[in-house]
Amino acid sequence: MSTLKEVQDNITLHEQQLVTARQKLKDAERAVELDPDDVNKSTLQSRRAAVSALETKLGELKRELADLIAAQKLASKPVDPTGIEPDDHLKEKSSLRYGNVLDVNSIDLEEPSGQTADWKSIGLYILSFALPIILKALYMLSTRGRQTIKENKGTRIRFKDDSSYEEVNGIRKPRHLYVSMPTAQSTMKADEITPGRFRTIACGLFPAQVKARNIISPVMGVIGFSFFVKDWMERIDDFLAARCPFLPEQKDPRDAALATNRAYFITRQLQVDESKVSDIEDLIADARAESATIFADIATPHSVWVFACAPDRCPPTALYVAGMPELGAFFAILQDMRNTIMASKSVGTSEEKLKKKSAFYQSYLRRTQSMGIQLDQKIIILYMSHWGREAVNHFHLGDDMDPELRELAQTLVDIKVREISNQEPLKL
């Protein structure tokens, strides 16, 4: 390991070399200005590379020097025979050893991790773009979301399309749509758009357009979303007209409508109206002015399509429509149910099976309630009792091969593998 003097001498030497290299770089830049031939350009590039390498090395040496000085200070500090740090408040040594020092200087308490998004500014930003680039980005982050996120994790990507541009001095320049691809350690700003936030706001603003283009996330596809929405108006009308077990039965047949799910939803709408937040109301008003397909009743042809791309919470534009946040929770439960079925039928230890289970519902519930509204669990129960069995019967469980066909194919595989090798055949 280098001594303190060696590192200091190294720093002095590199600083001298850097001064010389920078002077040579300036000379090369002047030479290119006077005669921009290939030789001068090549010399300029090599001079830049040399300066960059020296700056990098100098930075490393300075960090090494700082570490050595810190280590010397630590070594010279008197060690308490009790093993307790000088600023520790304990009178007796803890059974736990001292761990890492966590530096929190970089954390901004005004914008903590996991905060509620600024939906108004996010919504207005998205509304400022042409519809084609929004729908194409939605397709890339839902239908092809897994691949896009995997390839770009930890970066801030830009979507580009001919439909999105701005004119500067009469010249068209591309206007990019920015989306951040965070890692688990990333801290997102309130107005920063992540894939989850983008799917949430885009589906909430343009459900009719999502329906017209049949953009469905694979996560929703495997729980039979396409089948579920096929006769949506007929399905929701039958549901709203059904008898509600949470309302008292009416003695007069003429008042039967007062004991239906529709009557319960009307009461729920009055409760929701009292929970409205001004920012989201402003966003809804602006969205209507910008021709977004906003709806005020769950019994609308495109209402269910706000969940087509598996948003991680109820879109803010549908938050104040009775039954909509609960419908998203119903879909989240279906995702958990399917994953539980898949985990149950898989081979492995109980711990391995538990890892394959999911918590979509808990995540959805937490994120939606952070927007200022409490979900009505009774409505989720109504959805599950009316549509649960049918939905489960239309899950895609990834095992569509007939058992006899599988057995026959496996036999042929076994025979061929034994003919050409002495290895054990794999299972189909």
Swiss-Prot record:
* UniProt site (Important for the endonuclease activity): 88, 103
The compartments listed are:
Virion; Host cytoplasm, Host perinuclear region; Host Golgi apparatus, Host cis-Golgi network
Annotated region (Interaction with host UBE2I/UBC9) at: 188-191
Task: Provide the effect of residue 104 to A.
Answer: Loss of homomultimerization
- Enumerate the UniProt keywords alphabetically: Chaperone, Coiled coil, Endonuclease, Host cytoplasm, Host Golgi apparatus, Hydrolase, Nuclease, Ribonucleoprotein, RNA-binding, Transcription, Transcription regulation, Translation regulation, Viral nucleoprotein, Virion
Q: Where is this motif: YxxL?
A: 178-181
Q: Where do the record's region annotations for Interaction with host DAXX lie?
A: 372-428
Which portions of the sequence form the region Interaction with host RPS19?
150-175
Single GO molecular function: endonuclease activity
- Disulfide pairings: none
Q: Name one GO cellular component term.
A: host cell Golgi apparatus
Segments carrying the region annotation (Interaction with glycoprotein N) are 80-248
Q: Where is this region: RdRP binding?
A: 1-50
- Sequence segments annotated as region (Chaperone activity): 1-100
Which Gene Ontology BP terms does the record give?
regulation of translation
Enzyme Commission designation: 3.1.-.-
Q: Where is this protein primarily located?
A: virion
Q: Which residues form a coiled coil?
A: 4-71
Region (Viral panhandle binding) location: 1-175
Q: Which residues cross the membrane?
A: none
User: Does the record's keyword annotation contain RNA-binding?
Assistant: yes
Q: What family is this protein classified in?
A: Belongs to the hantavirus nucleocapsid protein family.
Assembly mode? Homotrimer. Homomultimer. Homomultimerizes and binds to viral genomic RNA to form the nucleocapsid. Interacts with host MAP1LC3B; this interaction participates to the protection of Gn from virus-triggered autophagy. Interacts with host SNAP29; this interaction participates to the protection of glycoprotein N from virus-triggered autophagy. Interacts (via N-terminus) with host RPS19; this interaction probably mediates the loading of the 40S ribosomal subunit on viral capped mRNA during N-mediated translation initiation.
In the UniProt entry, what is the domain comment?
A: The N-terminus is required for chaperone activity and, in trimeric form, this region likely serves in high affinity vRNA panhandle recognition. The N-terminus also contains a coiled coil region, which probably participates in but is insufficient to initiate N trimerization. The YxxL motif is indispensable for the interaction with host MAP1LC3B. The central region is involved in specific RNA-binding. Has distinct cap- and RNA-binding sites so it can bind simultaneously both the vRNA and mRNA cap.
- Protein name in the entry: Nucleoprotein
Q: Name the encoding gene, please.
A: N
